[in-house]
């Protein structure tokens, strides 16, 4: 079963924000989604969920049941659009491009990168960047050829690619 989504992302916006993202992605173990939409700490330690008393999984008198999926999993899927952080980051430009003078208002910067996520693109993370005044232009493809799409500044369009017979045999 295909599990990864390949993305080509280009970001442009206020220099101070773009530089922070760029520097963070250059680190040995970058956490792009966590930087943009931080997951609350308690999601790591919340092993049980409260269920209604009539729910079939409700096994205790306290209304709590062991949850088969950890709280972080559901939170990430809802708030990041993917269960894991971005991985295998490769920059498409060698350097951060600065547009203007960093000591003056209105200075911008831009860079592009390629990465993978689990199952789909991190649309909520991209939306958060757009809300911060950052331009996001991204193309994405499912590794199994089930979908592909384009995201530009809050507008997402995805489709099923047309596959020829050879592609279908390889799937």
How would you name each of these model-derived features?
Residues 1-171:
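Long, contiguous binding/interaction regions
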């Amino acid at each position: 079963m295909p599990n990864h989504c390949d993305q080509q992302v280009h970001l442009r916006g206020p220099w101070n924000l773009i530089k922070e993202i760029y520097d963070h992605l250059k680190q040995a173990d970058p956490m792009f989604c966590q930087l943009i939409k931080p997951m609350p700490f308690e999601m790591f330690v919340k092993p049980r969920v409260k269920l209604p008393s009539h729910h079939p999984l409700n096994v205790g008198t306290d209304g709590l049941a062991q949850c088969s999926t950890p709280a972080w999993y559901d939170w990430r899927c809802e708030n990041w659009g993917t269960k894991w952080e971005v991985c295998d980051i490769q920059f498409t430009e060698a350097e951060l491009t600065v547009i203007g003078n960093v000591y003056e208002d209105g200075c911008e910067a831009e860079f592009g990168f390629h990465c993978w996520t689990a199952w789909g693109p991190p649309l909520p993370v991209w939306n958060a960047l757009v809300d911060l005044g950052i331009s996001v232009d991204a193309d994405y493809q499912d590794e199994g050829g089930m979908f592909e799409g384009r995201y530009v500044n809050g507008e997402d369009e995805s489709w099923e690619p047309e596959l020829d017979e050879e592609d279908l045999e390889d799937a």
